[in-house]
Structures are given as C-alpha cells and as structure tokens.
C-alpha cells in the first residue's frame, strides 16, 4: 500500500514542483504538499490511491 507522511502539514503555500499523486477521490494532485493539504481538509478521509496521475 502506498503511503505519504502528512504529519508536517498543512502548509500555507505549496511549491510548483510536479510529482503527481492520485488520491482516493480519483483526483490527481500535483505534488505531496497539495495532496497533504487536501488530506488535512478532508479530516483524514482522503487517502493515497497510487503515485502518478489518476
């Protein structure tokens, strides 16, 4: 199972670095920061489906 450590999030701003991750909501997030901020916003219900685009 793919996992991402989001313990140091949320962050106020994310870089434009592009390393896509696919969330359990079937949405592609541009990088770990964007994904982790969304995880925090979802109260932990969002999980990582896999690395790369959905």
Swiss-Prot record:
Its main location: secreted. Disulfide bonds join 6-36, 14-33, 22-54. The record marks 16-17 as: Reactive bond 3. The keyword Amino-acid biosynthesis does not apply. Residues 4-54 form the Kazal-like domain. It is found in: Secreted. Glycans are attached at residue 43. Keywords: Disulfide bond, Glycoprotein, Protease inhibitor, Repeat, Secreted, Serine protease inhibitor. Signal peptide: none annotated. One of its GO terms (cellular component) is extracellular region. GO terms for molecular function: serine-type endopeptidase inhibitor activity. InterPro entries: Kazal-type_SerProtInhib (IPR050159), Kazal_dom (IPR002350), Kazal_dom_sf (IPR036058), Prot_inh_Kazal-m (IPR001239). SUPFAM superfamilies: Kazal-type serine protease inhibitors. Pfam families: Kazal_1. Avian ovomucoid consists of three homologous, tandem Kazal family inhibitory domains. This is Ovomucoid. It comes from Dendrocygna viduata (White-faced whistling-duck).
